[in-house]
């Protein structure tokens, strides 16, 4: 039933805070690549068997140039997958440089947290990253997918254009056409 319902899926994306067992199940059912980043609740050694972590990396998967940055704003003195905006700016700059050296604009940017002011929350835990606003303005990926902020009952905006990038909160899940993301 899962294979038939999602027969056109070419790539699975995990935006953090999803159990590895769940992602592994989806990979085995659909038999397509999985690109993922860790969330702020994931363990330091979070790994998904059959998946590819794109945290701080970029790669081509099924013809799609994918890059990712996991984690959230730092809200504890010591916390796994938590960063200050300055730390994330450094990570984003390295990722942008790596993708440029690879000679390809990023098609799909995956993150856990959203950009600052887009789908984020008013509290420190759910604040977005200004570094992502800069990354989107400079790198101009076609699409950014993020999680972290849990939208209840469709009361909040989950799709926003920022610069040239369509930004989508994928909570709880989304099927997206890369050619016509909505």
Question: Which residues does each predicted region cover?
Answer:
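Conserved catalytic scaffold of divalent metal-dependent phosphoesterases
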Residues: 37-127
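Structural motif corresponding to alpha-helix initiation and N-cap regions
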Residues: 20, 129-130
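Active-site environment of divalent metal-dependent phosphoester hydrolases
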Residues: 1, 18-24, 40-46, 74-78, ...
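Proline-aspartate-enriched helix->loop->beta-strand connector
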Residues: 32, 106, 132-146
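Binuclear metal-dependent phosphoesterase catalytic core
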Residues: 59-63, 84, 135-138, 151-182
């Amino acid at each position: 039933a899962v294979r038939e319902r999602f027969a056109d899926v070419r790539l699975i994306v995990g935006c953090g805070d999803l159990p590895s067992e769940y992602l592994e199940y989806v990979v085995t059912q659909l038999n397509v690549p999985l690109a993922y980043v860790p969330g702020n609740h994931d363990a330091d050694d979070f790994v998904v068997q059959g998946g590819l972590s794109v945290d701080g990396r970029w790669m081509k998967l099924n013809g799609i140039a994918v890059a990712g940055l996991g984690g959230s704003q730092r809200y504890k003195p010591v916390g796994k997958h938590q960063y200050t905006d300055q730390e994330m700016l450094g990570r984003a700059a390295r990722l942008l440089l790596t993708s440029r050296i690879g000679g390809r604009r990023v098609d799909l940017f995956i993150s856990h947290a959203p950009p600052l002011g887009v789908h984020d929350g008013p509290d420190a835990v759910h604040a977005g990253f200004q570094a992502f606003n800069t990354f989107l303005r400079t790198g101009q990926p076609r699409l950014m997918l993020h999680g972290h902020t849990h939208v209840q009952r469709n009361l909040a905006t989950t799709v926003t254009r920022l610069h040239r990038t369509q930004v989508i909160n994928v909570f709880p899940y989304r099927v997206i056409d890369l050619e016509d993301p909505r």
